[in-house]
């Protein structure tokens, strides 16, 4: 199993068979607390402990450990999850405090969804995480991407012991790669082969890493920089591990993927997989935390997309853009020099500065939207060039609990022309504050198990991030009738229309059997982009079935609950209290947000 930055807080891969498993397997449910479950999970996923900054004290031994990505390791994790479910049920039904019961109940929802996914013996089922995929390795999945990013961004090196732990994890990486390769071989035997265009992109990204000299690789240069003041030949040791272990393991994985490529077809959707329709139904349920069918999601996406385009049309006309479809006019606006950045490194620097400015502007406005504030500790960083080819435009998430590792807003700067001055503001609010980084810090105030399972509720997390974009507008960032203000409102509506369009193409690809070309053409017209410009997005949907649907489902539900509370409470409704309730309750199924709204109405 592999991890994204956010998923480090919410995914596990087994390295040990915990002592609780034999008792659970015999039908005896051992007495447990939510802290017991959290501690066990961290020992299954030591990288998560490091990312959270809690691999200290009793958990200090985890800093040099790595998760087990082999078939046996994944099977152990599955066994642990199945064993944890009755233990959590006992906590919910037992005499404990309300906070522990709620945390256990939320964790139950996450673990049950993951356990349902184990019925499909291929790909990667996240354990209370959002990144489910039918392919073990792809252009945006695999330790070839995640391990360098983790070691560089999250593994601290302040002491000799820290540096040795870094070396230990680097030395364990070949075993992780080989574990993934073994699962790729097993999936090949099941007929699970990624689309040809996905394999081409994946092998291309791997070749970028493989083509570097060991001394220049991120995971070597990062250690050399971090350990500069610590006596030892750290860089030389890392280079030897890379040359003797990592590169041969990467070669073995690439060789297996090349075998996959000889068998690959262009079919893009999950429907082609063993039990493909059932797999997609599960993936859609995992992503939305609802029972919406593909047809319902598809229809809702079309409806919302049309509504946002009607609003965009009015703004475009006010800006003098009156001819052609909304998509065609947005393509024209994308080239307007008033809203573009320079090419090359100059434009990349401009974009980073622009984002920092938007963060500085929104920060003092946030007390208007919340009674309870968090730090909003965020750093803006470029996605590594080797990852950019298969990465989305941006992503973000919180840092460590103690704040020593900041939250990150990762921005794809492969081509500065992909970003404009009217779409970057709303993207910033989505990924940084008051979006993912902001929400993640509230989630870290929960009991530890609640923090760990938060990644399992994509509809809430992404719904909140879209709601954060909405909050920014409500806080006045687009007030006024200047061209810049109108363009900013247009960027926000375009973001919403973009997420509505995702619902259409995701269900189109996986349920309606759209080809990649049909999905790209529809999406390009719907979003005002080019076919080339939307290709990475479409390819992402191909390998993460259902995930793209959670955004608007979650955003719509949060707004539905807000309107319900306003109608029921009248003058008692408190805007800031509602926002506190939604974000302070942590990442959870949408049904829990509805329950919390009921309590707010009745209070």
Outline where the language-model segments fall.
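N-terminal export signals
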Residues: 7-26
């Amino acid at each position: 199993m592999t991890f994204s930055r956010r998923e480090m807080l919410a995914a596990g891969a087994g390295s040990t068979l915990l002592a609780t498993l034999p008792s659970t397997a015999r039908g005896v449910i051992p007495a447990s607390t939510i802290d017991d479950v959290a501690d066990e999970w961290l020992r299954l996923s030591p990288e998560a402990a490091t990312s959270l900054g809690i691999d200290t004290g009793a958990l200090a031994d985890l800093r040099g450990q790595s998760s087990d990505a082999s078939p046996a390791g994944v099977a152990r994790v599955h066994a642990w999850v199945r064993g944890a479910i009755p233990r959590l049920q006992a906590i919910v039904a037992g005499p404990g405090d309300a906070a522990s019961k709620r945390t256990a109940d939320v964790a139950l929802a996450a673990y049950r969804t993951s356990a349902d996914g184990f019925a499909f013996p291929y790909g990667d089922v996240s354990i209370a995480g959002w990144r489910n995929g039918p392919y073990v390795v792809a252009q945006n999945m695999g330790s070839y991407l995640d391990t360098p990013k983790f070691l560089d961004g999250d593994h601290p090196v302040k002491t000799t012991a820290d540096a040795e732990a870094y070396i230990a994890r680097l030395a364990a990486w070949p075993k992780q790669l080989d574990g993934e390769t073994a699962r790729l071989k097993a999936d090949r035997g099941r007929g699970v082969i990624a689309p040809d265009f996905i394999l081409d992109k994946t092998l291309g990204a791997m070749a970028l890493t493989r083509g570097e000299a060991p001394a220049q690789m991120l995971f070597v240069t990062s250690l050399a920089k971090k350990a500069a003041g610590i006596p030892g030949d750290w860089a030389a040791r890392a280079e030897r591990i890379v040359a003797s272990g990592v590169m041969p393991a990467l070669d073995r994985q690439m060789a297996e993927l090349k075998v996959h490529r000889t068998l690959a077809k262009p079919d893009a959707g999950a429907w082609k997989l063993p039990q493909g329709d059932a797999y997609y139904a599960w993936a859609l349920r995992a992503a939305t935390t609802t029972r919406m069918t593909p047809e319902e999601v598809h229809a809702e996406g079309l409806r919302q997309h049309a509504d946002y385009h009607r609003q965009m049309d009015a703004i475009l006309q006010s800006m003098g853009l009156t001819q052609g479809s909304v998509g065609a006019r947005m393509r024209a606006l994308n080239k307007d020099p008033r809203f573009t950045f320079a090419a090359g490194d100059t434009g990349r620097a401009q974009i980073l500065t622009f984002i920092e400015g938007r963060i500085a502007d929104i920060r003092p406005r946030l007390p208007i939207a919340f009674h309870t504030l968090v730090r909003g500790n965020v750093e803006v960083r470029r996605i590594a060039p080797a990852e950019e080819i298969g990465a989305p435009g941006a992503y973000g998430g919180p840092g460590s609990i103690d704040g020593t590792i900041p939250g990150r807003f990762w921005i794809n700067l492969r081509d500065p022309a992909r970003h404009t001055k009217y779409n970057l503001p709303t993207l910033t609010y989505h990924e940084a504050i008051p979006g993912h980084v902001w929400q993640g810090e509230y989630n870290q105030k929960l009991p530890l198990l609640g923090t760990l399972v938060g990644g399992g509720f994509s509809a809430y997390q992404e719904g909140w991030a879209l709601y954060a974009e909405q909050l920014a507008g409500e806080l006045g960032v687009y007030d006024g009738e200047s061209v810049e203000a109108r363009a900013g409102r247009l960027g926000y509506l375009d973001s919403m229309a973009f997420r509505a369009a995702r619902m259409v193409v995701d269900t189109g690809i996986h349920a309606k059997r759209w080809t990649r070309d049909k999905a790209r053409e529809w999406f390009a017209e719907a979003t005002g982009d080019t076919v080339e410009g939307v290709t990475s997005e479409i390819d992402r949907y191909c390998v993460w079935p259902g995930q793209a649907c959670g955004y608007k489902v979650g955003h719509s539900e949060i707004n539905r609950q807000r309107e319900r509370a306003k109608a029921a409470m009248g003058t008692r409704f408190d805007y800031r209290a509602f926002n506190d309730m939604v974000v302070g309750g942590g990442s959870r199924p949408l049904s829990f947000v509805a329950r919390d709204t009921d309590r707010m109405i009745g209070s």
